[in-house]
UniProtKB/Swiss-Prot annotation:
This is M-phase inducer phosphatase 3. GO terms for biological process: cell division; G2/M transition of mitotic cell cycle; positive regulation of G2/M transition of mitotic cell cycle; positive regulation of G2/MI transition of meiotic cell cycle. Keywords: Cell cycle, Cell division, Hydrolase, Mitosis, Protein phosphatase. The keyword Transcription regulation does not apply. It catalyses: O-phospho-L-tyrosyl-[protein] + H2O = L-tyrosyl-[protein] + phosphate. It holds the Pfam family Rhodanese. It comes from the Eukaryota. It comes from Xenopus laevis. PROSITE patterns: RHODANESE_3. GO terms for cellular component: cytoplasm; nucleus. Belongs to the MPI phosphatase family. The gene is cdc25-3.
Length: 572
């Protein structure tokens, strides 16, 4: 009986990536020597049966084997930096300690025994890039679909040495091994032009291979590209056609425009980085012409940092004022302040077309100066509006009262107005202790309102001559509070006792400055010639007592009689 020991049919030797199938027939008995060819065929059939039972793919096919460059192209079929997909596997850089790149080697069986004469049983491949399953599935993949699988970017390989005799032929096996084993220069660029790829990957007739690959096959990615500059190789490659590739036509029928202009901003970058770098740049410069097109009427609370600081914008919201500055508000104000007594010069102006409405006369249309002049004319008249004031008057603190100076009072006392005045009365409205401290000669001390009312209105006095007048003059210490109150009280009572405008005492006066200003200048007209102020230290109790009586008398009078106040009315 024959015992067989089958080694793994696809075993990599020395990390060179060469996969071969070995079979060793160990027999306890010597093999038959009659027909050695039949024995070999029998052994091969047994090996094939074992492989089929274990679902293993055959390493050889009736098609031509892969050349090193073809295997390299198939290995990088999944390497595409422009597809935007994440690589399925990263490059293992643990074996890259040496500067030389990993070199493809031939199978150990051929190197040792050399029994495999047919080129169909020999192919070269990188370790980790091609598995036996791929060769089995290659028949199922159509060649037409491989154009999308072909990478736009090839891995970096050593640059070829320039040959003195011209371009090296790939059919020369000695030169082929020399090209891949002894790189003497830096790695070349990754993105090869189309004609270079065609020239370097064109196989010889004896090494023609039909390659097909499934898009779903999992491939190991060696690494990322290094540069995008194409290498400079000697030789003319324009005469080489795509149909000479014999199996590579579908793979390398890449558009030249797509190869020259990568679909990204940078050819050796991924899709996301290419989109970022090839996108429109944001310009930070702002042109003034573009800014001027923006509406200037729009208010901006915050200025954008990218906008320039100085823009040709007006300072006001309305930079150009209208030519016609006559607004309805201004016209109304001008008409309200105009006088109706103005000359009719404005009528000469051309009238506006259309119906014009005439404004009714109101107090605002009357000139205020004419009203004041008219009032001044009435103010010169006495209380019953029958005559003018006999004594010269001055303005004082209270506009409704008539003031005279101390000089006028002294002249009246000296008899300078006897032709006009029949009799005059000087009423001292101060408290009794003030009156006793010093007062004007012939003055009456009446510090309460009821006393003044009883004295003048119970039995009214009349002048003996119609041309003569009765004059009453009020004063207090300063003629600021008590004297004006007493004067107004008498006028109110007099108005209440007569029909308007008749009065018993139409001519009332108030001494300006009071006794305080009159005493220093006319002491001879005062008796005793002294001055006692209201807030004297010796008369505090008297001050409180008289104030209380004055308030009580005023309250009683208001309760007895109805109150007739003429606040703000002219008293004459």
């Amino acid at each position: 009986m024959i015992k067989e020991r089958v080694t793994p049919p696809f075993q990599a030797s020395g990390g060179s990536g060469v996969v071969m199938a070995e079979s060793h027939i160990i027999s306890s008995e010597a093999p038959p020597k009659s027909n050695p060819g039949l024995n070999i065929r029998t052994n091969c059939r047994m090996i094939l049966n074992l492989l089929r039972e274990k679902d293993c793919s055959v390493t050889f096919s009736p098609e031509q084997p892969l050349t090193p460059v073809t295997d390299l192209a198939v290995g990088f079929s999944n390497l595409s930096t422009f597809s935007g997909e994440t690589p399925k596997r990263c490059l293992d850089l643990s074996n890259l300690g040496d500067e030389t790149a990993p070199l493809p080697t031939e199978s150990p069986d051929r190197m040792s025994s050399g029994k495999l004469e047919s080129p169909k049983t020999q192919f070269v491949q990188f370790d980790g890039l091609f598995t036996p399953d791929l060769a089995w599935k290659a028949k199922k993949c159509p060649k037409r679909n491989m154009n999308s699988v072909l990478p736009h970017l090839l891995c970096s390989t050593p640059s070829f040495k320039k040959a003195s005799g011209g371009q090296r032929s790939l059919s020369n096996k000695e030169n082929e091994g020399e090209l891949f084993k002894n790189p003497n220069c830096k790695p070349v660029a990754l993105l090869l032009p189309q004609e270079v790829v065609d020239s370097q990957l064109s196989p010889t007739p004896e090494n023609k291979v039909d390659i097909s690959l499934d898009e779903d096959c999992e491939m190991n990615i060696l690494g990322s590209p290094i540069s995008a500059d194409p290498p400079c190789l000697d030789g003319a490659h324009d005469d080489i056609k795509m149909q000479n590739l014999d199996g590579f036509a579908d793979f390398f029928s890449v558009d030249e425009e797509e190869m020259e202009n990568p679909p990204g901003a940078v050819g050796n970058l991924s899709c996301s980085m290419a989109i970022l770098l090839s996108g429109p740049l944001l310009n930070q410069d702002v042109e003034i012409s573009n800014v001027n097109n923006i509406s200037l009427n729009r208010s901006r609370l915050y200025r954008s940092p990218s906008m320039p600081e100085k823009l040709d914008r007006p300072m006001l919201k309305r930079p150009v004022r209208p030519l016609n500055s006559e607004t309805p508000v201004r016209v109304k104000r001008r008409r309200s302040t105009s006088s109706p007594l103005q000359p009719e010069e404005e009528n000469c102006q051309p009238q506006r077309r259309g119906t014009s409405l005439k404004k009714t006369l109101s107090l605002c249309d009357v000139d205020i100066s004419s009203v004041l002049d008219e009032d001044c004319g009435h103010r010169q008249l006495i209380g019953d509006f029958s005559k003018v004031y006999a004594l010269p008057t001055v303005t004082g603190r209270h506009q409704d009262l008539r003031y005279i100076t101390g000089e006028t009072l002294a002249a009246l006392m000296h008899g300078d107005f006897n032709s006009l005045v029949e009799k005059f009365f000087i009423i001292d409205c101060r408290y009794p202790y003030e009156y006793d401290g010093g007062h004007i000669k012939s003055a009456f001390n009446l510090h309460r309102q009821d006393e003044v009312t009883d004295y003048f209105l119970q039995q009214p006095l009349t002048p003996l001559m119609a041309q003569k007048r009765l004059i009453i003059i009020f004063h207090c210490e300063f003629s600021s509070e008590r004297g004006p109150k007493m004067c107004r009280s008498l006028r109110e009572e007099d108005r209440a006792s007569n029909d308007y405008p008749s009065l018993y005492y139409p001519e009332l006066y108030l001494l300006k400055g009071g006794y305080k200003d009159f005493f220093p200048e006319y002491k001879e007209l005062c008796e005793p010639q002294s001055y006692c102020p209201m807030h004297h230290q010796d008369f505090r109790e008297d001050l409180l007592k008289f104030r209380t009586k004055c308030k009580t008398s005023v309250g009683d009078r208001k309760r007895r009689e109805p109150e007739f106040r003429l606040t703000g009315q002219r008293l004459g």
